[in-house]
Structures are given as structure tokens and as C-alpha cells.
Amino acid sequence: MLKKSSKKSIKSQEKYMRPPWDAYFMEIMRSVAKRATCDRGRASSVFVKDKQILVTGYVGSPVGMPHCDDVGHQLRKTIHEDGTITEHCVRTVHAEQNAICQAAKRGVPLEGSTVYVNMTPCRTCAMLLINSGIKRVVAANKYHDGAESEMMFKKAGIKLEYLSEDVVKYKKQKG
């Protein structure tokens, strides 16, 4: 015969706390980043609408092309007006761009969605996100060269939220 215990177990006394939606989708974004194939960011994105995932993307080379992790970076130098020289890897497609491509291939509208990203999207990705009709960007960190993107999102009426004020900076980059 089993005896009923009058004492509740410690485990049953601890109340389980479900994560808020933003934390939940950011954790998924971090998992998606594990598929990234360029170590200069390991960026990813998750597009969500009405608490449902629409599409995900991660930084990687175009289909069938070699990956940075396998053959190294394809760096391009830029000489800026102030004389500063920076380098940017051009082998890969950015996470936001890959997700937008996946949405287009599958016929998934992104209008009115929220995108969860590692850092402030670059200028080109910001333009694509604006034209995709997103309403909100949630970024884990700031991008060292993200000021122009921040301004563009503001002008477009897109809400940009940061979970951290930490700034992501790459080697040989301005900012």
C-alpha cells in the first residue's frame, strides 16, 4: 500500500515560468544561427506574425556555392571618404535576405510581421525589410555600423527594439 506524503516535493513547489514571446522567438533565432556558415557573424533571423513562425534564415553562401567555413572568407576592401579602409565578406547572403528569399519561394507574405535578429540589420537588409512590410525588428545587439538602418526604420515607422546595448563589431570595420 502506498502512503500519501503530506509534504509536497520541492520540484512541485517551484512554479514553471513560460518565457515571454520575444524571449521564446529569440531563443529560436539563436538555434537557427547554428546553421550559419560564416564565422564573421553567425547571424540568423526569424519572421513571426500572430505568434507563428513564418520563415527563418541564416547567413550562408548561395545554394551550391562554397561556404566561408569550408574555404575561407571572400573579403572586399572599401576605402571610405575619410580614408578609412574596411573589409566585408561578400561570399554570403545575409540572414534577413535568405529568409526573404525563402518567403518568396513559398509564397509567404511578410507584411505586418516581426523579425528577430542577432544585431541591427545592415543598410541593404533594412531596405529589404522595409519593402517587405515588416512592422517591428527585435535585435539581440546593436551593429557597429547600424546608425543608418536605425534612421531608416524610424522614417519608415518600423519599431526597432534592442534586448542589449552591446555592440557587435568585426575586425577591420568602421565604428
Would you name each region that the model predicts?
Residues 1-175:
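Zinc-dependent deaminase catalytic domain
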